[in-house]
């Protein structure tokens, strides 16, 4: 069964990613999104639009040994700050959300790509996404 975890903020992300990547039998996917408010609403419009497609892709295509680490990058002001550690981290260099990364690989989707079920399927199946996203 796919395991899903949610963390908020950069330090919590780093800690969770380090811990979860210790499981060598699991495939770790990190999904960066905007922060949700108390009502569960995300300030990021693209994140809201991608959510149902992403949920469907997890259900249909993710291996049962997958781990989905959802990371809330902060509120709109925090995300816009050029000093935000998610922007400055040399491993991430996040420029837009949502972004989905197959952890410890170059395989990733960002922005509108996270709304495309076919691209999500390819990512979870680890096929050559680069050829498709360059079109």
What is the predicted role of each segment?
Residues 6-8, 58-83:
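Thiol-based oxidoreductase modules, predominantly thioredoxin-like and allied folds used
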Residues 43-47, 79-85:
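Short, surface-exposed loop/helix-turn segments at secondary-structure junctions
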């Amino acid at each position: 069964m796919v395991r899903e975890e949610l963390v908020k903020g950069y330090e919590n992300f780093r800690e969770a990613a380090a811990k979860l990547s210790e499981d060598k039998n699991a495939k770790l996917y990190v999904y960066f999104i905007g922060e949700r408010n108390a009502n569960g609403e995300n300030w990021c419009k693209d994140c809201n639009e991608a959510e149902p497609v992403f949920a469907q892709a997890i259900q249909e295509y993710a291996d049962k040994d997958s781990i989905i680490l959802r990371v809330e990058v902060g509120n709109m002001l925090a995300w816009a700050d050029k000093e935000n550690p998610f922007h400055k981290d040399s491993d991430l260099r996040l420029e837009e959300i949502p972004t989905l990364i197959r952890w410890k690989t170059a395989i990733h989707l960002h922005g509108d790509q996270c709304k495309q079920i076919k691209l999500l399927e390819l990512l979870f199946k680890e096929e050559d996404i680069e050829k498709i996203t360059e079109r």
